[in-house]
Amino acid sequence: MVLPAMFGAKEPHVIGFEPCHCPEAERERIERMSEENERRAREEAEKRREAYRRAGIRPRFLDAESPMAGGIMAGVREGRGAYVFGPVGTGKTHLASAVARMAVDDGMRVRVTDMPGIIARLKSTFGTQASEEDVLSGLSRCGLLVIDDLGKEPPTDWTLTQVFRVVNDRYETMRPVVVTSQYDLKALGGRLSRNGDIDIALAIVSRLSEMCAKHEMRGADRRLHGQG
């Protein structure tokens, strides 16, 4: 506040307020700052979790972390994928989800899916204005594609052809893919060709072999031991 000059003074009087520096006021300011920082941290964490959900990471794995994820992610940044295989319950999906989280945090467009998910999305276009090409393009052109549990269900010729189209497109455009499976690549070829064309199955396996570093997961079923 500025008051006119008084009592013969040549300059106006300036009356202002200074913050109180007493211990109680300082403590209140620190508490307010701490609460604000916590609020912002919660909002940022929720934004990240929503980004993970949009990428297709399942709720159980939204907080997934793994000491192996950093090495795989380093390869992803250079355009190299990963083939993670091993018995049921050894942490394959957990690891793939941890990599997907890191890719989202890197700003990559990520899509996490599985064979039934791919087929469901393709079939959802039947009788609509959407096309199979729209779905396949979304899977082929994202920065990182994660296909979980490949080979769990033996595919038909039609299903196998769609998977080949996605894998081949990513192979030709040098976009990374992370795949999990119960089978090593040799066994995967036999599994995929059980109800489908063996040549297409082997073509998928060949491309994955070149595109991906192999990571074998070993050990007992973590779910049965309460570690899932």
Predicted ranges, named:
Residues M1-G70, G226-G228:
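A short, basic N-terminal segment
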Residues I57, M68-G81, F85:
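P-loop NTPase catalytic core of nucleic-acid-dependent motor ATPases
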Residues M73, V104-R141, P154-D157, T161:
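Short glycine-rich substrate-engagement loop in P-loop NTPases that contacts/grips substrate
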Residues G79-S97:
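Walker A/P-loop nucleotide-binding motif
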Residues T93-G107:
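P-loop NTPase Walker A phosphate-binding motif
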Residues M108-R109, R141-L144, Y171-V179:
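Loop/turn-to-beta-strand initiation segments
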